[in-house]
Amino acid sequence: MIMWQSLILISSGAALGASLRWGMGLILNPLFAAFSFGTLIANYLGCFIIGLIMAMIWQHPQFSGEWRLFMITGFLGSLTTFSSFSAEVMENFIQQKWLIGLGIMSAHLFGCLIFTGIGVLITRWLN
C-alpha cells in the first residue's frame, strides 16, 4: 500500500472517531455537569470495539491491514486512546503476562496523572 493511501484511511477514520467523540460530549456531558459522561462512554465504546476487532484479528489473521488502519489507528485512535491501552493490557493478561499487564496499567494511569498535574502546575506558574 502506498503511504498516501494509508494516510487517507487513517485520516478518514480519525475524522469519524473525533466527530463521534465530540457529538457524544455535546449530548451526554450536560446530563451530568460534574462528570464528563460523554468521555467515559467514548472510552467504554472504544474499548468494546477494539475488543471486538482484536478477537476478529486473532480468529482471522488475514484481516485486512487497510481495515486495521482505518478502524484502530484512525477511528479508535481519535475516539479514544484508552482503547489501545486497554487492548495492550488485555493482550498481556490473556497471555498470562500478569506483571507486564499490571506494569502497563500502572505506567499509563500514574504517568498520565503526573503529566496532567505537571501541565496544570506549569499553566498556573505561567499565569
Swiss-Prot record:
Family to which this protein belongs: Belongs to the fluoride channel Fluc/FEX (TC 1.A.43) family.
An example Gene Ontology CC term for this record: plasma membrane
Domain of life: Bacteria
Stated role: Fluoride-specific ion channel. Important for reducing fluoride concentration in the cell, thus reducing its toxicity.
Presence of keyword tRNA processing: no
Coiled-coil intervals, chain numbering: none
Lineage: Bacteria, Pseudomonadati, Pseudomonadota, Gammaproteobacteria, Pasteurellales
Biological source species: Mannheimia succiniciproducens (strain KCTC 0769BP / MBEL55E)
Membrane-crossing segments per the record: 7-27, 37-57, 69-89, 102-122
Any GO MF annotation of the entry: metal ion binding
Residues bound to Na(+): 77, 80
Gene giving rise to this polypeptide: fluC
Activity regulation remarks: Na(+) is not transported, but it plays an essential structural role and its presence is essential for fluoride channel function.
Keywords, in A-Z order: Cell inner membrane, Cell membrane, Ion channel, Ion transport, Membrane, Metal-binding, Sodium, Transmembrane, Transmembrane helix, Transport
Membrane topology, record value: Multi-pass membrane protein
Biological-process GO terms, alphabetical: cellular detoxification of fluoride
Chemical reaction(s) catalysed: fluoride(in) = fluoride(out)
Primary localization class, coarse: membrane
Protein name from the UniProt record: Fluoride-specific ion channel FluC
